[in-house]
């Protein structure tokens, strides 16, 4: 599968020189090497510790196999349902992966009783609860964890048999999980949340739900190489220029919805909204249902 990005009209004319300039400057190769100076001198201290997402995805294959083995172990105990407690990218990525694969995963990304209570009152004997937070201190996720711990105890179930934690090393959640005896999968602190779908934060819940995460890693690595390649056809370079072009009349991104990729529009909306506008300028993403 190959990725392509194309556009026409005035936007194409505006982007073409920028694409050429970045290509001649070797931007893709510099990004692939983890060059933290690409965002300017003021950003170097932060960028230098946030570029883990450009590394080869093969690094996560051992973890993926561990997740597959855990799913088989849990299935042997009759635990086949997965609930994911996480906010933003921690839940939207795995949700899209599961929908694409045609497997079920219940998402808890709100503390509203209407979304939480039906899962708490249901029998949890056949359920794995994945608690996912990079910082390990997300209030909504922590509240959901406590609610499920209480519900499990009420049903006479041992929380450590049903809770799986995904967090960064040495976070508050990491320490709490160790103390409670939960299974723990650790992320990479150099990978930001918006880039974490093919790290433990996406792979663990999706894999436990039944997604073929090894296939996702293989496809993701092919896309990574394509998006870090030199040449004017680099899809990431083209899309980045289209979003960043200095045009006061271009400030919105209309996202269609695709039957073949349910939830993808909502995920892209969250990624673009979270990732742009840091300097007072950005793109407003809008999901156009029915378009």
Describe each region flagged by the PLM.
Residues 57-59, 89, 165, 256-260, ...:
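Conserved short loop/turn motifs at secondary-structure junctions
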């Amino acid at each position: 599968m190959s990725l392509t990005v194309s556009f026409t009209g005035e936007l194409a004319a505006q982007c073409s020189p920028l694409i050429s300039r970045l290509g001649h400057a070797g931007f893709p190769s510099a990004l692939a090497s983890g060059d933290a100076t690409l965002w300017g001198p003021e950003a170097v201290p932060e960028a230098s510790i946030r570029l883990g997402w450009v590394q080869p995805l093969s690094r996560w294959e051992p973890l993926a196999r561990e997740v597959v083995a855990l799913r088989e172990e849990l299935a042997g105990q009759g635990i086949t349902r997965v609930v994911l407690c996480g906010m933003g990218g921690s839940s939207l990525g795995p949700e899209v992966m599961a929908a694409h694969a045609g497997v079920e995963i219940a998402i808890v990304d709100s503390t509203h009783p209407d979304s939480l209570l039906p899962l708490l009152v249901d029998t949890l004997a056949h359920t794995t609860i994945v608690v996912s937070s990079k910082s390990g201190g997300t209030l909504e996720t922590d509240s959901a964890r406590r609610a499920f711990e209480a519900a499990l105890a009420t049903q006479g179930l041992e929380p450590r048999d049903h809770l799986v934690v995904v967090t960064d090393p040495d976070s508050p959640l990491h320490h709490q999980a160790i103390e409670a005896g939960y299974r723990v999968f650790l992320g990479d602190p150099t990978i930001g949340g918006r880039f974490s779908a093919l790290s433990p934060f996406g792979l663990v819940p999706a894999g436990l739900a039944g997604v073929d995460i090894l296939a996702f890693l293989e496809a993701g690595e092919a896309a990574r190489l394509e998006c870090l390649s030199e040449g004017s056809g680099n899809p990431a370079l083209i899309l980045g220029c289209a979003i960043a072009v200095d045009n006061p009349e271009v400030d919105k991104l209309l996202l269609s919805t695709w039957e073949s990729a349910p939830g993808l529009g909502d995920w892209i909306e969250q990624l673009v909204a979270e990732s742009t506008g840091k300097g007072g300028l950005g793109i407003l993403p809008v999901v156009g249902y029915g378009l």
